């Protein structure tokens, strides 16, 4: 999967807005362009929360895509923009925001 931190998405949009667009109908993908294995993503969350998840593996489901990530080459070519946030930092920032916003204590977070 391609996980993209919100600040990178906002910066990507600003890069487009701040610069004249040669083709006003061109579509740009904004994403991380670095696929992350789902188990690696889960491991990052576990580490940030200092909790261990119970993982149940299932067969691939109809409609599931094996690999998916954004091709951001046009965004880079036209605006020299690349996302900067790695998965560890982005997940940590999101979890910190979530716990603070919802006033949840990490040790009280119920995971199922």
Locations of regions flagged by a protein language model:
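C-terminal substrate-binding subdomain of Rossmann-fold SDR/epimerase-dehydratase oxidoreductases
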Residues: 1-112
């Amino acid at each position: 999967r391609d996980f993209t931190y919100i600040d990178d998405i906002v910066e990507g949009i600003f890069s487009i807005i701040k610069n004249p667009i040669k083709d006003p109908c061109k579509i740009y993908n904004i994403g991380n362009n670095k696929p992350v294995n789902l188990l690696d993503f889960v491991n990052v969350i576990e580490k940030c929360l200092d909790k261990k998840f119970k993982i149940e593996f299932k067969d691939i489901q109809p409609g599931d895509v094996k690999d998916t990530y954004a091709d951001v080459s046009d965004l880079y070519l036209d605006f020299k923009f690349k996302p900067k946030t790695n998965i560890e930092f982005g997940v940590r920032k999101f979890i910190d925001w979530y716990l603070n916003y919802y006033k949840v204590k990490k040790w009280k977070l119920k995971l199922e």
